[in-house]
């Protein structure tokens, strides 16, 4: 059999992306969330905030964290005050996630903070921070990809995919997300 692989060098696709220590930390977190939070009634937001803080999350006041959301690494999550992480939201945040005040992640939204370089023979793992400024709304089932910066007041419509930065006080929709229209900046007119 003829092969182009270097037998002495193990296949890059089979190498782990994370250390055993990291995997054990995330396993501990997942089990604790399952036992302490996943089953809790929706109104117990403060309890879930407390548990997240015990695992290193930096959270502002009056956050609404729903029990069936999935946060990959709470120690890489930072929020300001009055942030909503809704039902079914998934934060895959190996590069970190920052959520500005009054930002909302609606049901089943997905923030994906990592990918792989598919052009590399090493299939290199790439992680990027996702940032949402204040008053950003990520609508139901929308996806935000690695490294995307959502500027103040931007909206990503339902089931849309943001692969590029979102401009301030603008509405985006589609896959890939495209600018639709301006959002009324209620901060200037209140």
Question: Model regions: which residues?
Answer:
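Terminal amphipathic alpha-helical/low-complexity segments used for targeting or macromolecular assembly
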Residues: 1-57, 61, 135, 153, ...
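Short alpha-helical DNA-recognition segment
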Residues: 63-66
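Glycine-centered loop/turn positions within well-structured domains
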Residues: 97, 160, 168-170, 178
């Amino acid at each position: 059999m003829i092969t182009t692989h270097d037998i002495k060098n193990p296949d890059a696709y089979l190498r782990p992306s994370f250390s055993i220590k990291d995997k054990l930390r995330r396993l501990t977190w997942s089990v604790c969330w399952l036992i302490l939070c996943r089953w809790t009634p929706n109104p117990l937001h403060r309890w879930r905030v407390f548990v997240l803080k015990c695992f290193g999350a930096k959270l502002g006041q009056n956050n609404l964290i729903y029990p069936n959301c999935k946060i990959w690494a709470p120690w890489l999550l930072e929020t300001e005050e009055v942030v909503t992480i809704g039902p079914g939201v998934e934060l895959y945040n190996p590069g970190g996630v920052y959520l500005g005040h009054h930002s909302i992640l609606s049901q089943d939204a997905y923030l994906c903070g990592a990918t792989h370089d598919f052009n590399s023979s090493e299939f290199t793992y790439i992680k990027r921070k996702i940032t949402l400024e204040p008053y950003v709304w990520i609508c139901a089932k929308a996806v935000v990809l690695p490294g995307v910066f959502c500027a103040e007041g931007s909206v990503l419509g339902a089931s849309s995919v943001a692969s590029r930065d979102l401009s301030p006080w603008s509405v985006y929709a589609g896959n890939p997300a495209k600018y639709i229209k301006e959002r009324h900046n209620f901060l200037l007119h209140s």
